[in-house]
Amino acid sequence: MPFVRFTESGRSYKPKVSIRVNGTIGFNAGAIRKWKLDGFPFIVLFYDKESRAIGIKPVKVAEEEGSHKLNFGKGKKSAWVSCRKFFDFFDIAVQDTKRFEGQFDEKERMVIVQL
């Protein structure tokens, strides 16, 4: 069996979503790669109160209703969106920064984060 060279860099290849005390949602390099977030400058947020899940839908245009600018760190190895109003509106308490393994829902075309 031939060997395959591993050339990826970054802290983790596993996609992670952080929900931070300051009202931001962050994405690590693994999430940006796996979900191709670097091709989407905006996201739209959704919330399912019954299942306590956040939906994060990447979009290409600012005109999409409810869109938020996705900010990228140096080299696009991290990304974040400021969304304190989202947490306040849905009364989602964020007392500590927490990391989650989001799942991409192909049907809905969005990342689902189960709180």
Explain the meaning of each model-derived region.
Residues M1-T24, A29-L115:
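Long, contiguous, secondary-structure-rich segments that constitute the structural scaffold
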